[in-house]
């Protein structure tokens, strides 16, 4: 197969529709302005070649007519973004995927599968990964768990990498001999073969060492404790942690908060700061600080609601 055929195969999704995007030179809030729309015709080999040649940008719809997917993605809209740091985190968690630069400088993290998997299963695992990365609010593709084809649903598309492949800004970043490399299209295709995984194995990947240590903790706290809590959000994180510990361990929540402060906070809060939080929490029942940082970036609502 040639490169266009390989790319078409890798991004197999909804059979009877695809996306197209026209990008302008103007920028708004760091993003390139673009006009995107659904075309109710299949994504063909000719269209993929046109994308590679820089004539017409296309996107693929991950969810198919049976509510399954063979690829998925996280769309991280953060500018500027350290793509290398993102790769390091993903490698730490042993997540098989490819980080690509998006058209505006953010990141599309692509996952590829050897078999079709339920879109709902992918979205649940992707939410766990995004929370661990500190991008819990990013978009997940497929954006739907289920579509109703009989009423005309087609799902949302994601723009594909390697538009105008010879001089593209939408390239994959891969590690080669300890260095980060802007991959050519052929290297990207090779990388896809390396990261493709059976869905059941993907779903079993443990995300973060603290998942095993604290399986009953809410997802944001697992992620924060796994990566460590640093200056800039320690007091809010300690308060949030205290709210959880009070509910989960009513008899010894104070000592557990002190233990976490000593082990997981860098540098630890002072004794007086911890006591102040404990005294405040004793006065009345408080809600979680879900919408505040650093918790909101590590949020996994779908799991949290089940706990």
Regions found by a protein language model. Name each.
Residues 93-96, 127-136, 263-264:
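A common structural junction motif
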Residues 51-60, 90-97, 223-229:
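Short amphipathic beta-strand starts and helix->beta connectors
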Residues 136, 158, 172, 179-182:
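Extended, Lys/Arg-rich, non-catalytic nucleic-acid recognition/anchoring regions
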């Amino acid at each position: 197969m040639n490169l266009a055929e390989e790319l078409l195969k890798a991004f197999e999704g909804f059979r009877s529709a695809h996306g197209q995007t026209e990008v302008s030179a103007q920028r708004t809030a760091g993003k390139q302005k673009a006009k995107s729309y659904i075309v109710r015709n299949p994504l063909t080999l000719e269209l993929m070649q046109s994308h590679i040649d820089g004539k017409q940008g296309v996107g693929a719809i991950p969810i198919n007519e049976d509510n399954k997917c063979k690829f998925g993605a996280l769309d991280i809209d953060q500018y500027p973004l350290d793509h290398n740091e993102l790769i390091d985190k993903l490698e730490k968690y042993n997540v098989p995927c490819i980080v690509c630069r998006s058209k505006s400088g953010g990141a599309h993290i692509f996952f590829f599968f050897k078999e079709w998997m339920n879109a709902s299963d992918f979205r649940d695992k992707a939410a766990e990964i995004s929370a661990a990365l500190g991008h819990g609010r990013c978009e997940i593709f497929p954006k739907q768990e289920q579509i109703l084809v009989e009423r005309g649903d087609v799902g949302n598309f994601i723009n594909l990498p390697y538009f105008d492949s010879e001089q593209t800004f939408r390239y994959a970043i891969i590690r080669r001999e300890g260095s980060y490399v802007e991959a050519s299209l052929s290297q990207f295709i090779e990388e896809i073969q390396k990261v493709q995984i059976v869905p059941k194995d993907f779903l079993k990947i443990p995300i973060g060492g603290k998942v095993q240590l604290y399986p009953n903790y809410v997802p944001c706290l697992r992620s924060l404790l796994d990566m460590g809590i640093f200056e800039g959000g320690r007091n809010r994180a300690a308060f949030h942690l205290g709210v959880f510990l009070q509910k989960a361990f009513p008899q010894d929540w104070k000592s557990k908060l002190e233990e976490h402060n000593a082990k997981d906070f860098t540098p630890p809060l002072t004794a007086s700061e911890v006591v102040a939080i404990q005294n405040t929490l004793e006065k009345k029942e408080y809600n979680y600080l879900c919408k505040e940082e650093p918790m909101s970036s590590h949020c996994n609502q779908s799991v949290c609601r089940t706990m």
